[in-house]
């Protein structure tokens, strides 16, 4: 009896458990059904909301040859909401002036109301020359070529990444004859290294006036051609600017790299060792510590002769090396010459000087350098104020076929006595003549695009049609900027053709 009761109880409990599970399962299904229903209602509501709030596509664009969009260029955004911010990066040589929507800041975000495309408006920088504004402390006048004044420098009207305001610097006058003109040249030294117009970071820069060059273009053209060559282009970057000093407009200037031993310029060894890097200038003005080889003076530009680390041994070392090179070029062993001198650089330098008939090539501003353990290199050609027919007292340099550099520069004179060097010049001309023609065409296009700025310069300095030394009567009679520019163009075309005929007799181009 007792056993039967136990069995009955167990059976009863089992039934309760089974029915409980079924009941729970039934409730769960009901809950799932309810949840499903609610979910369906939510989806339905969302679908309704989406239909009521339209999504639109916005495309931010620019000419990819001029710049690029930074950020999400194509975005899908609900009506009434804002796009994610994007900005425009502009390639060097161009500037951003606004968006097609009317916005003027480089970064943009808009509230969306329709499908649309918004384009960045980018134009060449050459449409307007950059401005450089210099304020000296207390607006003190710059009167010295040796004493610096403190100043701040601002650059505008250029690619955004090269614009800045109130950078600390120092400024002084520079030049010899050029300092005597009304329009003064300057030397600028920033407190920290600055990259001006993509030409590499440096503290030292030069502001040339081109005052006696009534085309304002000779130095610009010469440095532009120099930039084509692989061995002499270390310090040839230039940029036209409109200069303001103490809020006074001073005209169009040319910002140039200072020829110096520096990263991104002439990159040679700096050390206290005797066999270190040397930068030398052939300079009959003897502007600094110098030595002579024969009757020609050479000034040591680097290492600094004012440094306590500089000794007589340094001077003797570089003088001895240059003497060995000079003896070699006067001899008959061309292999010996090539072991001491980088003849490629001298051939390229010769082409530039001869093409432009640079008057001072044998007198001053002829740079050479030698790295530790290395050969003697020709440096970047420099100073073309007197060139392309501006000759002063050097009447023999006037004709485009004068071969002035060959006759006046002692290094070129002796090197060109070697047939191998003549052949090298011919090979270089054959290779580079088409590139030179193309580069010059680009340069003249740039000049004419900026006509307004150049003509404004002569509103400040009313010298067209008047005598400015060292111009002769022929150049003085060219009384418009256009006539002056056209003169340089014709001269260069004739000069290049003459050099090709002289050194590339088999060239049929």
Model-derived features: where do they sit?
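C-terminal motif of bacterial Sec signal peptides marking the signal peptidase cleavage site
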Residues: 20-23
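Short, well-structured beta-strand/strand-turn elements
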Residues: 229-242, 358
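Secondary-structure capping and domain/repeat boundary segments
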Residues: 35-38, 42-124
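Internal "kinase-insert"/substrate-recognition segments embedded within catalytic cores
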Residues: 194-195, 209, 231-234, 248-351
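Extracellular interaction modules
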Residues: 81-83, 103-125, 148, 178-183, ...
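Bacterial signal peptide processing site
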Residues: 25-27
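Middle-to-C-terminal accessory/interaction subdomains
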Residues: 129, 142, 167, 175-177, ...
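Conserved NTP-binding catalytic cores of kinases and kinase-like/nucleotidyltransferase enzymes
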Residues: 125-217
């Amino acid at each position: 009896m007792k056993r039967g009761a136990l069995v009955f109880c167990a059976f009863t409990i089992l039934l309760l458990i089974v029915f409980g599970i079924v009941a729970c399962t039934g409730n769960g299904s009901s809950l799932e059904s309810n949840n499903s229903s609610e979910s369906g209602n939510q989806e339905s509501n969302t679908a309704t909301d989406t239909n009521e709030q339209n999504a639109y596509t916005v495309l931010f664009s620019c000419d990819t040859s001029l710049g690029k969009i930074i950020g999400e260029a194509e975005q899908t955004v609900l009506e009434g909401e804002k796009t994610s911010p994007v900005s425009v990066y502009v390639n060097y040589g161009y500037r951003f002036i606004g968006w097609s929507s009317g916005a003027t800041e480089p970064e943009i975000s808009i509230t969306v109301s329709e499908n649309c495309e918004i384009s960045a408006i980018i134009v060449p920088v050459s449409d307007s020359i950059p401005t450089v504004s210099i304020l000296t402390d207390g607006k003190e006048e710059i009167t010295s070529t040796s004493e610096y004044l403190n100043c701040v420098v601002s650059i505008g009207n250029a690619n955004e990444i090269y614009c800045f305001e109130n950078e600390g610097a120092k400024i002084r006058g520079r030049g010899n004859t050029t300092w005597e003109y009304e329009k003064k040249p300057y030397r600028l030294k920033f407190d920290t290294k600055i990259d001006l117009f993509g030409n590499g970071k440096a503290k030292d820069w030069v502001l040339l006036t081109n005052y006696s060059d009534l085309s304002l273009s000779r130095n610009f053209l010469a440095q532009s051609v120099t930039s084509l060559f692989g061995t002499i282009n270390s310090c040839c970057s230039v940029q036209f600017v409109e200069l303001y000093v103490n809020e006074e407009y001073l005209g169009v200037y040319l910002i140039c790299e200072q020829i110096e031993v520096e990263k991104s310029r002439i990159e040679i060894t700096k050390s206290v060792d005797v066999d270190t890097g040397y930068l030398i200038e052939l300079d009959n003005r003897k502007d600094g510590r110098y030595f002579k080889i024969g009757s020609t003076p050479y000034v040591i530009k680097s290492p600094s002769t004012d440094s306590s680390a500089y000794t007589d041994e340094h001077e003797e070392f570089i003088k001895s090396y240059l003497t060995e090179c000079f003896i070699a070029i006067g001899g008959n062993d061309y292999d010996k010459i090539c072991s001491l001198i980088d003849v490629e650089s001298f051939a390229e330098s010769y082409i530039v000087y001869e093409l432009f008939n640079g008057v001072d090539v044998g007198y001053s501003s002829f740079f050479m350098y030698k790295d530790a353990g290395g050969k003697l290199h020709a440096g970047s050609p420099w100073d073309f104020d007197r060139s392309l027919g501006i000759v002063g007292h050097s009447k023999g340099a006037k004709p485009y076929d004068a071969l002035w550099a060959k006759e006046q520069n002692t290094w070129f004179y002796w090197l060109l006595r070697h047939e191998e060097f003549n052949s090298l010049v011919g090979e270089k001309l054959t290779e580079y003549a088409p590139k030179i023609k193309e580069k010059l065409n680009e340069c003249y296009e740039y000049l004419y695009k900026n006509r307004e700025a150049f003509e404004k310069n002569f509103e400040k300095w009313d010298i067209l049609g008047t005598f400015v030394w060292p111009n002769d009567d022929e150049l003085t009679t060219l009384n418009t900027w256009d006539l002056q520019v056209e003169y340089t163009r014709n001269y260069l075309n004739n000069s290049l053709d003459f050099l090709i005929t002289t050194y590339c007799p088999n060239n049929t181009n």
